[in-house]
Amino acid sequence: MDIKKILAEVKRGCAELIDEERIEKLIKNYYEKGENFFIKAGFDPTAPDLHLGHSVVLTKMAFLQKHGAIVQFLIGDFTGQIGDPSGKSATRKKLDKEQVLINAKTYETQVFKVLDKEKTQIKFNSTWLNELGAAGIVELTSTFSVARMLERDDFTKRFKEQSPISICEFLYPLLQGYDSVALKSDIEMGGTDQKFNLLMGRQLQRVYNIGKEQAVIMMPLLEGLDGVNKMSKSLNNYIGVTEKANDMYAKILSISDELMFRYYELLSQKSLEEIAQIKKDIEQSNLHPKKAKENLALEITERFHSKEEANNAKSEFDRIHSQNALPSDMAEFEIQGKIWLAKALVECGLESSTSAARRSISANAVSVNSQKVSDEQMYLKQGEYILQIGKRKFAKLKVKE
């Protein structure tokens, strides 16, 4: 087995890797001695759905599962009630335990679309953090100083601005680090925004003398559909892993050619050699970028749905955009009495608010019965309408007297 080749795939797309020698040794020991190793990634269930940005870490862990890794998928049901302060400019609102547990349950079903279930352990950090007790918390806090905490950019900024920083926010990185002590993890993965917390795990493993210091793999934050900002539900530039196959396929096709290769690097399970060949074929005009994007969309959609659903999504997309046909699964709505178009777009689920609807209208993105609309004050009277925003959002509306 070519360990160097495997390591090159591990490093692919990484923003930073700490203790590469340890990772190489862990993989080597698996092939020479049959020894598995543990790789941890923590997810605070602060929202019910994961998106492709979250799956960057999952994809890397799925690769490592093929080479000896047992994934410790850690659901931060305890820390999720605090909220990770990383990158935040204000104290986060605490979530109640019931909502955290509801969100956590949905995570379990979503991650196995990427991870090998037989090589994955689902862990909840309340298991050991509830047992830590006051004495344990005091001992834990004694391992780190306030001065070190204030080295974090987000805390420093808030401290200088005299914005509130709660004590429990100081506790968050300590508790996340203690997770690595409890789990005896060999590797921890996370985004670049998690570096402080990830290094805390290494330090606490040393302090608690568990006989190992975890290596750290940091992945970059995936850009959203706009190609500029990180993928985020709040920015509406995300692709949810539970989205319908048709929507997932269409959204991936909407990304730029430049962003396509970023997605290939971070989300595709194709090898480095295969991706290099795709780039070469495009450069030599042997492969059209659109075809490469279609292949990527098929691969990712199949991962979260099925091969049949992915192929059906492609056929549906081609039918709509090549033949100017309407979606076969278009939602239908009925409304009594004439209605303001902006409100109709919200009622039909095409926009989240009338403000957003008005922005779409002013941006010339809204069509009514295939005709572009620019009048933000337009009303729909009795009749049947096909409402459309952009290339992907459709709804059929019947306005009754």
Swiss-Prot record:
- Find motif ('HIGH' region) and give its ranges: 45-54
The protein's UniProt keywords, in alphabetical order, are: Aminoacyl-tRNA synthetase, ATP-binding, Cytoplasm, Ligase, Nucleotide-binding, Protein biosynthesis, RNA-binding
Q: Which Pfam families match?
A: SYY_C-terminal, tRNA-synt_1b
Protein biosynthesis: present as a keyword of the record?
A: yes
Looking at the keywords, is Cell inner membrane present? no
Q: Where, by residue number, does ATP bind?
A: 233
The GO annotation for biological process reads: tyrosyl-tRNA aminoacylation
Give the catalysed reaction(s), semicolon-separated.
tRNA(Tyr) + L-tyrosine + ATP = L-tyrosyl-tRNA(Tyr) + AMP + diphosphate + H(+)
**Annotated EC:** 6.1.1.1
Where do transmembrane segments lie in this chain?
none
Organism domain of life: Bacteria
Q: Write out the GO MF terms.
A: ATP binding; RNA binding; tyrosine-tRNA ligase activity
Q: Which compartments does it reside in? A: Cytoplasm
Q: Residue ranges for motif 'KMSKS' region?
A: 230-234
Q: Which residues form a coiled coil?
A: none
User: What GO cellular component entries does it have?
Assistant: cytosol
Which residue numbers delimit the S4 RNA-binding domain?
Answer: 339-399
Q: What InterPro entries would the database entry show?
A: aa-tRNA-synth_I_CS, aa-tRNA-synth_Ic, Rossmann-like_a/b/a_fold, S4_RNA-bd, S4_RNA-bd_sf, SYY-like_C, Tyr-tRNA-ligase, Tyr-tRNA-ligase_bac-type
List the SMART domains: S4
Subunit composition and interactions? Homodimer.
| NCBIfam families (alphabetical) | tyrS (TIGR00234)
What PANTHER family does the record tag this protein with? TYROSINE--TRNA LIGASE, TYROSYL-TRNA SYNTHETASE
| Function recorded in the entry | Catalyzes the attachment of tyrosine to tRNA(Tyr) in a two-step reaction: tyrosine is first activated by ATP to form Tyr-AMP and then transferred to the acceptor end of tRNA(Tyr).
Question: Which family, according to the similarity comment?
Answer: Belongs to the class-I aminoacyl-tRNA synthetase family. TyrS type 2 subfamily.
**Official protein name in the record:** Tyrosine--tRNA ligase
